[in-house]
């Protein structure tokens, strides 16, 4: 893949991670959630080192509403929502391994119930990214 003046960019890199949870967790807890997700992105999905872009948002109880029993999964107030926007192209098996790695990591390190880990992957074409400078770094220059 020719990326113009950014030859080291990989087509599958650049996840943007949004983490939403109820307010009241410590800074250390929120930081650990971000680190666990980042490690799973590195280890399972092959995201390059330092490709870390996360937005962690706390919400009041009225600002985070969800069905507590949808699909037979019993969620508590500790439920966290992970929305990860990333380039298209990963297999279903790889995605399933990623979901498991995140849920396992959050359970093992933070004692978060696996039922309280809600993950949504949003896949986009590579031209939908601008890392700054008003440029689409994954797209070959047309000039």
Predicted regions located by residue number:
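Interaction-mediating elements
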Residues: 13-143
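Short, Lys/Arg-enriched N-terminal segments with co-localized hydrophobic residues
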Residues: 1-13
């Amino acid at each position: 893949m020719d990326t113009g003046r950014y030859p080291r960019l990989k087509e599958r890199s650049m996840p943007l991670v949004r983490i939403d949870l109820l307010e009241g967790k410590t800074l250390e807890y929120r930081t650990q959630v971000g680190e666990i997700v980042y490690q799973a992105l590195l280890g399972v999905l092959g995201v390059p080192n330092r490709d870390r872009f996360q937005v962690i948002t706390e919400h009041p109880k009225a600002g985070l509403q969800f069905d507590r029993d949808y699909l037979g999964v019993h969620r508590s107030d500790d439920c966290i929502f992970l929305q990860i926007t990333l380039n298209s192209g990963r297999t279903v098996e790889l995605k399933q391994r990623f979901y498991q790695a995140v849920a396992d990591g959050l359970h093992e390190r933070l004692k978060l119930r696996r039922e309280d880990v809600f993950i949504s992957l949003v896949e986009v074409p590579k031209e939908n990214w601008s890392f700054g400078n008003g440029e689409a770094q994954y797209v070959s220059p047309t000039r």
